[in-house]
Amino acid sequence: MHIAVIGAGINGISVAVNLLETLPGVKVTIFTHNVTPNTTGDVAAGLFRPYLVAEGDHRIKKWCRSTYNFLENFIATNPKHHKYGCCYLEVFELDTEPLEKTLFNEIVGNSRFLNEFELKRYPTAKYGLASTSIISEGKKILPYFYEKFKMLGGKIKVMQVKNFDEVQMIHNFPIVINCSGLGSRSLCNDMDIYPVRGQIIRIHAPWIKYSFNKAEHYIIPQSDGVVVLGGTTQENNWNTLPDENDTKNILNGCKTILNGLEECNILSVNVGLRPGRKSVRLEKENRTNFTTGNKYTIIHNYGHGGSGFTLFWGCAKDVGQLVSDILLKAKL
């Protein structure tokens, strides 16, 4: 069976890899307008942490745990995990108000409250939580998945996808998987999905070894001496150009968290549009091609907010199960 995947960000490429790894005889072609290094995921720092998703949705917990287990196994079994920007990272959550443990703390399972002595290092904070999480840098782990996808026989066709039917009829695909992120607003006419603009700054600061977040600001070191400063969470803002006021706000906010940022060189200022939605859409939909009359199934997998690198493998496994169920039913 030949399956089409629309979108080549972290969700699209991980879905494609999982299908090729788990379903013998399946062929996969990805159709996408952008490939790495030009996807939204390439901008992401890649810290494992649920963000801009409905944590009350029971599926989120399952997807988080599945992805965290995948990343732990990736580190344990891949000697080159640092090359692909994947490693453990100590994370400090700081606040002026008491902190409560969240789904993130439950998943990583190693969080502890900072004591009075430790908090003296952060004079603008009264409370803190320390945890060990995992980072999987978008610009490094995406090439890993692309390489693996091609090694498994996958194909990528770069094109602007205007509708599902045009993709389906290319090879009369019985299944089309929609991982188009924000593109689903037009592809599905889904007005529940909207942009959440995120602006970040990359600086050279190899002395920063831990991640910090306080209110809307965060500091996330990468594996090559680069540190990501953020951020913005601007709903329904389609501007993909850096904003000088946002840059100033990010720098000023991060300076209140950690001393010594004043002299760091700014390497780049980047903007990405996260696919915001009240809940992730992961479900199947039966369709009939308007032009050919052929029936096919769309599996939707989009609306991951700021948690693409936190949910991707759990969602990929669920998509894989839906595909497996369809294949099994077709044999009956």
Swiss-Prot record:
One of its GO terms (cellular component) is peroxisomal matrix. Its cofactor is FAD. One of its GO terms (molecular function) is glycine oxidase activity. The keyword Lipoprotein does not apply. Gene3D superfamilies: D-Amino Acid Oxidase, subunit A, domain 2, NAD(P)-binding Rossmann-like Domain. It comes from the Eukaryota. FAD binds at residues 8-10, 39-40, 45-47, 161, 180, 274, 305-306, 308, 310. Its main location: other. Disruption phenotype: RNAi-mediated knockdown results in the development of immature ovaries with large numbers of oogonia and also represses the development of testes, yolk glands, and a copulatory apparatus; as a result fewer fully sexual worms are formed. A motif (Microbody targeting signal) lies at residues 330-332. D-serine binds at Y218, R274, G306. InterPro entries: D-amino_acid_oxidase_CS, DAO, FAD-dep_OxRdtase. It catalyses: a D-alpha-amino acid + O2 + H2O = a 2-oxocarboxylate + H2O2 + NH4(+); D-alanine + O2 + H2O = pyruvate + H2O2 + NH4(+); D-arginine + O2 + H2O = 5-guanidino-2-oxopentanoate + H2O2 + NH4(+); D-asparagine + O2 + H2O = 2-oxosuccinamate + H2O2 + NH4(+). One of its GO terms (biological process) is D-amino acid catabolic process. PROSITE patterns: DAO (PS00677). It is found in: Peroxisome matrix. Catalyzes the oxidative deamination of D-amino acids with broad substrate specificity. Could be responsible for the degradation of diet-derived D-alanine in the intestine. Maintains the asexual state of worms and represses early ovarian development. Following sexual induction, the enzyme is required for differentiation of oogonia into oocytes in the developing ovaries. PANTHER family: D-AMINO ACID OXIDASE (PTHR11530), D-ASPARTATE OXIDASE (PTHR11530:SF11). Belongs to the DAMOX/DASOX family. This is D-amino acid oxidase. The gene is daao.
